[in-house]
Amino acid sequence: VEFFNSLYINSLLSGPFTQALNIKSGIYEALIRPIEQIGGGAVRADLRSIRLGFAQYQGMMMGFKNTMEATYLALKQGDAVLDPLMRTQDNLEIVGGKAVRPISGANLGFDGAAGTAIDWIGNVLELPSRLLMTGDEFLKQSNYRGRLWTNAIENTLERGLSLSSKEGKENLKRIFNEGFDKNGMANIKDNAINKKTLDYARESTYTNSLKGGSYRDWGSKIQDFLQNSPEFRFLAPFIRTPTNLWRHFGNRFPIQMPGT
């Protein structure tokens, strides 16, 4: 079933406009959220909030080289680097932090020459979903690094340290370096700052969890149903991202919408 679901989903993703829309909407969100914080700080005359809003942009620019390196790695290996568990394509099975490719020799029970041939065919057929994942990696890396820098600055200021002092610079460097494990994944184990940072990156790429959400949590319920009944996946190939897009719209609507 997942073999045919993968063919169907990749056919939907094969259009260049679909890929462009994914990147464009993610870039808009990455740029708008700091503006919201800066604007809110300006209205309240809160210089700290304004400073942290600009720090988000600073962090994204500072980490651009590393973001591109991680994005290339994701494209090369065909899997997410920073956050393998939450992604736009929500029908994939995750085992050991890696996505199981539906069209692969291992998944279909073939090895040797036959398995290699199926892997090659799968790489071609699943190229659209790989490109989608690569775009998500770029956006999520940018948001994560920007927010990590923002949270590092906030933590340093809360400790009463000057950002230009030796102690302040060491604290900034420590927090930023602790943001990733040895494989480049977000290091969220026993680290509240990094967990908060990853949540921000997920929200900015519309890949945050649907559980406990608005509209009586229907998005999460539909997602669970399709995970347990993949034969119906063709009815709604994507659940997480469209639901989060709608929730983001509801959160920004000037009048509270029913169910939010």
Predicted regions and their residues:
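Amphipathic interfacial helices
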Residues: 1-260
